[in-house]
Amino acid sequence: MQGKKQRITQLTELLDEAARVYEQEDREIMSNFEYDKLYDELKKLEEETGIVLAGSPTRKVGYEILSELPKERHESAMLSLDKTKEVPALIDWLGNKEGILSWKMDGLTIVLTYRNGELVKAVTRGNGEVGEVVTNNAKVFKNLPLTIPYEGELIIRGEAVIRYSDFEMINAQIPDADAKYKNPRNLCSGSVRQLNNAITAKRNVNFFAFALIRMDEMNRFKTMMEQFNWLKELGFDVVEEKLVTAENMAETMEYFESHIITNDFPSDGLVLFFNDIAYGESLGRTSKFPRNGIAFKWRDEIKETTLQEIEWSASRTGLINPVAIFEPVELEGTTVSRASLHNISIMEGLELGLGDKVTVYKANMIIPQIADNLTRSGHLPIPKTCPVCGGDTMIKQDSDVKSLYCMNPECLAKKIKSFTHFVSRDAMNIEGLSEATIEKLIAKGLIKELADIFHVKDFKEEITTMEGFGEKSFRNLVDSVEKARTPILAKFIYSLGIANVGLANAKLICKEFGYDFNKVSNATVDELTQIPQIGYVIAEAFVSYFQKPENKLIIEDLLKEITFEKEEAAGGSEKLKGLTFVITGSVEHFTNRNEVKDVIEQHGGKVTGSVTAKTNYLINNDNTSSSSKNKKARELGIPVITEEEFIQLLNEA
């Protein structure tokens, strides 16, 4: 059954991606014949197993916008579990019984109801007594079965979560640092409680079952492990669980602890239940907690240190956050010397003063925080001027939280987005200048305009004393800046951040005008719209950018720092026109995979990120690899060639 469930998941994702690309990008990644073949295979597997996942093309759920989320009272209150931070306490609690130890996932708890094999209701935990009905949203969870091979009524609980990888991908699409989601749990909560489930569908919410609440034959299973295995057979993903006794508890705890950092999903500790269902239920409950389970949170390692200064960090929206700088301490295996205080309210509540003795820890073993101020010498002054631009500041209050803002609309901190884009890999490719580093350089007043980046070598003392920098990293940064002084024209144009002008469009425009900057910068809308793939909107934005006086000054300063790498006016040959390549693995003859990509595009070819029926060649020096791309290429009969074979192909074309 598990093999079939995995194949159902694989087919659902593959067909969904094919439909998305066709509908949103007007291109095909598989032929109609291939699509129909895979569709028929999926439909047959769904009929055999009774499992239909959310997103299945055989049962597409229509999107719907609601005016509100109805509230519903739970049949029985959902109590929290009692907690401990001590492994010996877990062992004592379990005694001589068997237990089920599993992750306490950090998302949003959902109660699902199925009748006659169909998902009919989903309700959030809410306050434990009343939750919100989110059935429409649950129907677009990435891995949730809409139908199951069970005809009676089934009620289960589980956790809706957003994986770290999806969280980072979603945040990467949000340019404003302060608009980014703080953690996967907050993003998940907002996603599950959307009024428009089309938004939920884009968030890749996953559901992991952790409890069977009710079914028609409740006496069918004697242990929780049997319940978990049965839920897996029905098509549910279940929280990872381990059978434990007092003897193997410590060893099992070490297993879970070692996986915290590598897990792709957020967790907030562990939960332990008695495996024997009847025994656990016989224990009853207190007024606050059920007695059949207990939660575990790892004890935070707390260290005492001395507060050295408060750094005021300005951001793109004008928000100025206080950051505590203290004497370095070792926490959870890493050296920590700073922690965000988040806002004025927290800073005032801690009554911080320079030289105070403070205790610090890592929340969830990851994020440094100040736990307490042991000496409380008094409030630090709140700056009346912005540390970046010198403009006036203002304290704004939202509910009970006070935050500091710069009121200058021209504050340099708000330019971080353009700086970050300018140095990115596909633009000027300056390594060592992350957004965080750029923010520090701006905050210290070391860079004000884009051209200032080319003079960071003048600030060795200031930069080498910054956290994360030393002599070596400073030299690497300077070397990277110097290499960036000879860009190709297309990457320079892209680095300017012109609206709607990506690297591919920049290459088309530069090629059209013979890689001549003067011609490119003076192009007209009529000239640009003659280029295939350049429409009126892009052309107008392009021309408008170069006509603005402030942009002319920026470019004038930049041109004093760089010399364009000479390119052939012909822009390469058309040897590879009509051919699509995918590049994977390490390269030997080229500097990196991007260089291979540039060569292919210079000769009229196209490079994509995934192997599809439209791919002509997969370039991989290890053509015997069992990687997913190699497997896919073999399945589709696509040649897998080495770099040398690619070079030979290019020379012979």
From Swiss-Prot:
Q: From which domain of life does this come?
A: Bacteria
Keywords for this protein: DNA damage, DNA repair, DNA replication, Ligase, Magnesium, Manganese, Metal-binding, NAD, Zinc
The record's listing under PROSITE patterns reads:
BRCT
InterPro entries attached to this UniProt entry: BRCT_dom (IPR001357), BRCT_dom_sf (IPR036420), DisA/LigA_HHH (IPR041663), DNA_ligase (IPR001679), DNAligase_adenylation (IPR013839), DNAligase_N (IPR013840), Hlx-hairpin-Hlx_DNA-bd_motif (IPR003583), NA-bd_OB-fold (IPR012340)
According to the record, the signal peptide region is none
- What NCBIfam families has UniProt attached to this entry? dnlj, PRK07956.1
List the protein's name.
DNA ligase
Q: Which organism is it from?
A: Lachnoclostridium phytofermentans (strain ATCC 700394 / DSM 18823 / ISDg)
- The gene that this protein is the product of is ligA
